[in-house]
Amino acid sequence: MTHEDHLEDEHDHEHEHGPLAELVTVRDWLRYAVTRFNRAGCFFGHGLTDAYDEAVYLILHTLSLPLDRLEPFLDACIPGDEREEILEVIEKRATDRLPAAYITGEAWLGDFRFKVDPRVIIPRSYFAELLEDGFSPWIQDPETVTAAMDMCTGSGCLAILMAHAFPNAEIVAVDISQDALDVAAENIAAYGLEDRIKLVLSDGFAAVPEQGFDFILSNPPYVTRESMESLPAE
């Protein structure tokens, strides 16, 4: 037997046991993922509340299945290549401790989907709910807002929600990070809002155009360096 044959034989034996061989259905993989996440001590605070919800989301996303329809697929058998994809995702979450949003490359605020990656903080803001109501009662008529600013825009998610909440507004979205603005530009383009949202690279107001604003919103990173040391790995 050649060295190459020996390596191939070892690879075949690896697949005779373990999750790739023993876990067959979506239900099997869901149970396995929940156990792995719990044993790894994963933190859940980026839109999904526990190991089960995150396992459902990651498995359905990996298999390109509807995120709101688990039941019809629970006992579906998963081909070998897709099992490998699921195992890779589970390991990224449980071993590498990557947040689910960075694994899938997306995050949701309400019905709005946004691209995210490690260049930006994962969207998670109570401002989203306020913007759904046009920031009532502080703003009586959303259509009267014609100029608004999102300071520390990050992925651009709040600027995009502002554009929908205030249909007559032009939005200035500001961030100190060009990497973050690059992500924001992709999200803005995905919603066709390039004509209404202007991205500005600025340290605070330093490079912001001199103009008046009807509405200014800011949801900056608010964790101190000391607090960062005690945060979960995610």
Kindly give the residue locations of the regions a language model identified:
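Solvent-exposed amphipathic alpha-helical surface segments
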Residues: 36, 40, 134-138, 191
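N-terminal auxiliary segments of SAM/dcSAM-dependent transferases
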Residues: 3-110
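SAM-dependent Rossmann-like transferase core, predominantly class I methyltransferases
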Residues: 73-74, 80, 84-167, 174-186, ...
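Active-site catalytic microenvironments for nucleophilic, acid-base chemistry
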Residues: 61, 65, 165, 190
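Short helix-terminating capping/connector loops at secondary-structure junctions
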Residues: 47-49, 141-144, 194
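Active-site/binding-pocket entry motifs
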Residues: 64, 120-121, 222, 229
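Short helix-to-loop capping/linker segments positioned immediately adjacent to catalytic or ligand/cofactor-binding
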Residues: 41-48, 137-139, 206-207
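S-adenosylmethionine
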Residues: 168-170, 174-234
